Design a protein with these regions (language model features):
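Regulatory and interdomain segments flanking nucleotide-handling catalytic cores
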Residues: 1-181
Length: 181
């Protein structure tokens, strides 16, 4: 059975100076989400990143409009707690950002990268090093399949496809196993 995962992030009540989401705000959002688990949510996780509240929710593939409303309502409830406490950053509901990933299975691993006050490009150099630099990830040179390298696809770039050098990985493998002394 395939499903979907929706991630929602919103700054709805933080202290001091929007540095950390208030625990009561996070608790209220979490409570509202837990009340609705099972219909239509299969599971969820609520956390904070800096002054923002983050919700990761698993659900059926066709449920995402309904799920977005549910998550928006939970964020609105958290925002109300923030307003009542006079917290910073009680943005409006429309400031929440949502992303839905379709086609996830029961055992699909999900990795969510969240930053506070940084664009999505903040992760690009780190992920590139992780998957392309054999000095960062030695297994790249050890495994014959991984040694072929990776193709990176960057949207919005004039050259959208980049092939990582498989040759350097073969050289390192030869140096490691003693055939290239």
């Amino acid at each position: 059975m395939t499903g979907a995962v929706t991630v929602a992030v919103a700054e709805i009540g933080a202290f001091p100076g929007r540095g950390r989401a208030h625990p009561r705000v996070v608790e209220e959002v979490s409570r509202r989400i837990r009340q609705r688990e099972g219909t239509p949510l299969a599971g969820s996780f609520v956390a904070r990143c800096g002054g923002s509240v983050v919700i990761v929710a698993a659900h059926g593939p066709s449920d995402h409009p309904q799920v977005r409303l549910l998550l928006g309502d939970a964020l609105e409830a958290g925002r109300a707690v923030g307003l009542n406490r006079g917290l910073d950053g009680c943005g409006d509901r429309t400031a929440a950002s949502f992303a839905t990933i379709e086609g996830t299975g029961a055992n699909t691993g999900i990795l969510v990268f969240v930053t506070d006050r940084a664009g999505p490009g903040i992760w690009t150099p780190l992920l590139c090093r992780l998957f392309a630099d054999p000095f960062e990830t030695p297994r790249l040179a050890d495994d014959p399949v991984l040694r072929e390298g990776f193709v990176f696809e960057l949207t919005g770039s004039p050259t959208e496809r980049f092939q990582t050098p498989g040759g350097i990985l073969s050289l390192l493998a030869a140096l490691r196993d003693g055939t290239g002394r």
